From Swiss-Prot:
<dbReference type="GO" id="GO:0009742">
    <property type="term" value="P:brassinosteroid mediated signaling pathway"/>
</dbReference>
<feature type="compositionally biased region" description="Pro residues">
    <location>
        <begin position="1"/>
        <end position="16"/>
    </location>
</feature>
<feature type="region of interest" description="Disordered">
    <location>
        <begin position="1"/>
        <end position="33"/>
    </location>
</feature>
<comment type="similarity">
    <text>Belongs to the bHLH protein family.</text>
</comment>
<keyword id="KW-1070">Brassinosteroid signaling pathway</keyword>
<keyword id="KW-0341">Growth regulation</keyword>
<dbReference type="GO" id="GO:0009826">
    <property type="term" value="P:unidimensional cell growth"/>
</dbReference>
<dbReference type="InterPro" id="IPR044660">
    <property type="entry name" value="IBH1-like"/>
</dbReference>
<dbReference type="GO" id="GO:0006355">
    <property type="term" value="P:regulation of DNA-templated transcription"/>
</dbReference>
<keyword id="KW-0804">Transcription</keyword>
<keyword id="KW-0805">Transcription regulation</keyword>
<comment type="subunit">
    <text>Interacts with ILI1.</text>
</comment>
<protein>
    <recommendedName>
        <fullName>Transcription factor IBH1</fullName>
    </recommendedName>
</protein>
<feature type="domain" description="bHLH">
    <location>
        <begin position="136"/>
        <end position="185"/>
    </location>
</feature>
<comment type="function">
    <text>Atypical and probable non DNA-binding bHLH transcription factor that acts as a negative regulator of cell elongation and plant development. Binds the transcription factor ILI1 and forms a heterodimer of antagonistic bHLH transcription factors that function downstream of BZR1 to mediate brassinosteroid regulation of cell elongation and lamina inclination.</text>
</comment>
Amino acid sequence: MDAKRTPPPPTPPNPNPSVIGSGAAADGGGFGRGEAAAATKHMLAFHFLRALSRIHRATPVTRRTRTIRRAAYSSMARAASPRRAWSRALLGQARARRSRTLMRRAAVLVRRRVVAAPAPSPASARGVRIIAAGETSAAARAVPPPPRQQGEPPRADALRRLVPGGAGMEYSSLLEETADYLRSLRAQVQLMQGLVDLFSYQ
């Protein structure tokens, strides 16, 4: 057969960062910032490669590109600290997408299996529409920005829209979240560039 088998997912990295290598112990500095960054990159690579291993080659290119982009952001959020608002926001978006996908698949199965069913009464159908509309409007409702602090630049609201989970965040916390989000984005870009370089030489 010409079809290539999907490679198995990579081995998960060591969950205990204090024993990653012997460099930190030899230096006597304990688990420093450099080791923490290395552990985060290891976790990012693990989650991203595991997500890539689940993508089928027969998937259309446009859908595959969208899946890879979502996998990159989800793996970045899983590798980050769960205390970060941006990582929780990205993981929440991923869970919501999975829920919508499962609901659509369940609806398709129900339509296929139901051969003949009595039509719902107008009252029950109207109630279903009201509930669905309420859920949609509640989910789409934006979080209002907090009161502007003294010295806060006018473009802070634009930054709140760019950083996941930044809506409604006060300015000092927003700056901290932005810095951590940018560090993770930089690590993600380095990982993907390394993968491109690796496969370009094969």
